[in-house]
Amino acid sequence: MNISKKVFHLFLAAIMAFSFAACVSVVQAAPFTAPQKLDPYLYYMEYADYAPDLTTGEHVKLGFACSAVRNGNFYGRNLDLDYADVPEFVIKIAANEAEGRYASIGLAAILTLKSNEFDKVSEADLLALPNITFDGINENGVAMNCNVAPAIDLDFATLRSTNYGKPRIHAVSVVRYVLDHAESAAHGVELLKNMDIYGGYGSWGLHWMLSDEKETYIIECIDGELVVRNDTDNIMTNFYVNYGSYSKYAA
């Protein structure tokens, strides 16, 4: 073997070794703790960082009813799944001052798997999991949740955009975005007015209840517009608050 071939082989070996080391270092540096199983359906994880993906949630399995309630400093919801056997996660996100992100804690679920299929969850899935946070509260006391709502009487195509030309965000990722960046409920509303919200849960729309210690808002995408209502009932179900015949079932 001549000198040039030896040099080439040594160079190739070095590249392979470096690549392997880099892969190992990436695995070791995963910015979240290993899922801690709290019961057959619930896990707990802490994140130093995550992979923001505002397109998450384009195709999410449906089939449940839910209500959200706020009473003073108490904020809660029920989630009446008709297929309750899914892995759910309590997700604690660390603050990141450089990225303007506040600390928060919330709930997410992988609705396309059964609880006994947890071994099918990849590291990439876990890294992106915070994007599908359904409910949560941040360090400023801003609490938010999303519920599905029937879009039968709406032109659902118009729900694909609320503010054309602004940065786009999938409806499923709205809670995560607000928890990360909102200083108050009113600030959360202003943040969403500057985003183009699109999508839903399959053929269903989504709406949100956003609260802090002072006030509550119901936020909905109606025929291509973001509609915000300052709400004094402090309750939201699976029916639109700001639209037609459905609004009478809102609370």
Region roles according to the model:
Residues 23-186, 193-202:
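N-terminal mature-domain region immediately after signal-peptide cleavage
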Residues 16-24:
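Hydrophobic core
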